[in-house]
């Protein structure tokens, strides 16, 4: 009897502790003194470095760009590279006001850019001039650049949701049973990614695995009820910023009052650029050089950019 009571009290204590900690985190986030800068009418860049392990019992560095609804002068746009380019290169090439890295892709392997050889002979993949490395459905300006490819009739986590961009709105949608569901989405730009974190104001179930639970740099996009679009990156893999698991990222978007949110490619790909800022516009701390600085960008296959209409 005493053993059962001890177990019961332990369960109650642990539950109460984590509930109190969650409330503390939400209060901390709600009272954040963001560093804010208007980079264009209706477009704000916000950043904050949570120190002293004040958020999720960790240090966290977060950058956010908010795009007000009914934006007249700028639009969100999906762009791709014929091979691989850094997010800042994609931003510059498209005259972007700001940019974040996009969805998942095949990293550079044995292609001409690497000059790999076997027995003295170059080993080549398909030419970078006619091959996009995105491993998700990508539609740009109504042109399909890449397709989702199912394996064993199953979609991978990064193929289970999409961002659909129209002239005046951005939507986040979840996949359907139809194998060609992305083709039916209305939008001049469509980019598949995942997992979906929030849909119609409801938290979506997040798989209990290492990809989702472990802390990494993360890139994601959300949408508020009034139509405001939220682009977010959180740095990681450093003592200055631990990164987040998907459940923690899900909470951040809920606290930002988003009714839709979806994860993008993260890790060493995570990058945000703002035009006119130093370090080629890179404002976060990309990790591909394993240093906590602004110079560790990874080459990526696609990005989300804010460009003039």
Across the structure, where does each feature detected by a protein language model lie?
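Bacterial Sec-dependent N-terminal signal peptides
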Residues: 1-26
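Gly/Ser/Thr/Pro-rich low-complexity, intrinsically disordered segments
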Residues: 23-309
